[in-house]
Amino acid sequence: MKIYGLYGKSGTGKSYKSVEAVSKYGIDAVIDDGILIVDKIHVAGSSAKNERLMYAAIKKAIFFSEDHRQEVIDAIRARHIDSMLIIGTSQRMILKIIERLELPKNVQWLPIEQLQTDNELMIARERRNKGYHVIPIRPIEVEKTYSGWFR
């Protein structure tokens, strides 16, 4: 399996640009904030964005819980995935996710600055400061994945 690691600071538009990276590199699946996404559909895991505390969100994003970790490992193994994009805030975080999910350690690194213009980075930061989140799944999947956000 070919692994791509998209990394950058929080609020820089990684999830937004992941759609472009998936298309450009022909990537089959994405790991973003604790969920496995295939064809823009949430297929396994639970989102770190649902956590109220930063510490809990980080643990969720790196698959600290054994049940969460195993659910995603099983889903990956049940599918024919030749390439995967892992989104994280640092290379270290992505390597931790790779280790926890027992994925190949050879990573093609994609810094967000390689995919974003300075203007796009500025817009992403402004949106993040307003509390907006981009999620690389189909709109129909959003409420199922992010329960409680719309009430």
What are these regions (language model features)?
Residues 2-22:
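Glycine-rich phosphate-binding P-loop
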Residues 9, 34, 88-90:
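Fold-independent oxyanion-binding glycine-rich loops
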Residues 19-20, 27, 36, 87, ...:
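Polyanion-binding and phosphate-handling cores
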Residues 28-85:
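Conserved nucleotide-sensing/catalytic segment adjacent to the nucleotide-binding pocket
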Residues 39-40, 94-97, 118-121:
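Switch/connector loops and helix/strand junctions flanking conserved nucleotide-binding motifs
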Residues 76-108:
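Helical/strand "switch-coupling" subdomains that flank nucleotide/phosphate-binding cores, especially
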Residues 107-151:
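C-terminal accessory "lid"/substrate-recognition subdomains
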